[in-house]
Regions:
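Conserved N-terminal phosphate-binding loop of PLP-dependent enzymes in the Aspartate aminotransferase
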Residues: 1-305
Length: 305
């Protein structure tokens, strides 16, 4: 079947505007390590795909999945050691204050939980994000998808978008530390606005490498000041590590660590399972216990062995 036939078939069953990459879409049939192969056998170096963290079809991952599939597939409302073993290993890679975990299937679910934790802890509803970002597909998280709104602002009164920090095309006629202080001050102003409107401030969520925003070069000063403003206002800092985490920046295990700050909540997505539907939330014990005690949260497939 040629590409045109595939595209027509796709439109009939998936809808006319189902997203595809490239002017001439690529028909990928196989992956191995860093390589992808199309239907004609052509090999592509995969420098884009953000999901298979340790490479396509890694033999250790494939073997682990096959072994578990032939042993047990059940939800987490039974006792099982695997979820505990993994969660303990995961939390050990973070700062000591991030000591508890909830496992999910996707980054969207993880960010949903993070928002609920932040709002429950603070009593406010207001969430701050950047003005060109993406954090997932559910109704609540889509309100943060400012990269898909023409003016970079969410239609929800509970979300305020601040200019993402960028020295290449700065939002202010400033340079150096003064520029980064000006960007950080936008967070402070958004917090004050939430309080003045009676909405209350709950937290801020950033991808620490600002991947959706274009990977700008951001100094530690900016994030340190932002987190200071967030904590001074009683809010929480959510680090969306779906794309930045698990050592991808090369220097640190987690993207936010580059800035010398500690997150209150960290959200993880499918790279955690090398592309398979495994995600999670790692958080301070007080935040996670508050969430557990206030809501009957469970996830049939989140962390299932």
């Amino acid at each position: 079947m040629n590409n045109k036939e595939l595209i027509d078939r796709r439109a009939r069953i998936m809808g006319e505007n189902a997203p595809l990459f490239y002017e001439e879409p690529v028909h990928i049939v196989r992956g191995e390590g860093v390589w992808l192969y199309d239907a004609d056998g052509k090999k592509y170096l995969d420098v884009y795909n953000n999901v298979p963290h340790v490479g396509h079809c890694h033999p250790h991952v494939v073997n682990a999945i096959a072994k578990q599939a032939e042993t047990l597939n059940v939800h987490t409302r039974y006792l099982h050691e695997a979820i505990l073993d993994y969660s303990e290993r995961l939390c050990a890679t973070f700062d000591d204050s991030l000591s508890m975990a909830i496992l999910t299937c996707t980054g969207t679910e993880s960010n949903e939980i993070a928002l609920r934790m932040a709002r429950q802890h603070s009593g406010g509803m207001g969430i701050i994000c950047s003005n060109f970002t993406y954090h997932g597909n559910s109704t609540a998280v889509w309100e943060l998808a400012t990269g898909f709104y023409e003016d970079g602002q969410s239609p929800s009164p509970n979300v305020k978008a601040v200019p993402f920090p960028d020295a290449y095309r700065p939002a202010f006629d400033l340079t150096g530390d003064v520029l980064w202080e000006a960007y950080a001050n936008e967070v402070k102003l958004a917090i004050e606005s939430f309080e003045a409107e009676g909405i209350g401030f709950a937290g801020l969520i950033f991808c620490p490498i600002f991947s959706g925003e274009g990977l700008p070069d951001v100094p530690p000063l900016y994030m340190q000041r932002v987190v200071e403003y967030v904590h001074n206002a009683g809010g929480v800092f959510i680090s969306d590590e779906v794309q930045a985490g698990f050592g991808r920046t090369g220097k640190n295990m987690w993207g936010h660590q580059y800035y010398g700050v500690t997150a209150d909540i960290v959200s993880l997505g499918k790279p955690m399972g090398n592309g398979h539907p495994v995600g999670g939330v790692v958080a301070r014990a007080d935040l996670l216990n508050e969430f557990r005690n206030a809501s009957m949260y469970f996830n049939t497939f989140g962390g299932n062995p």
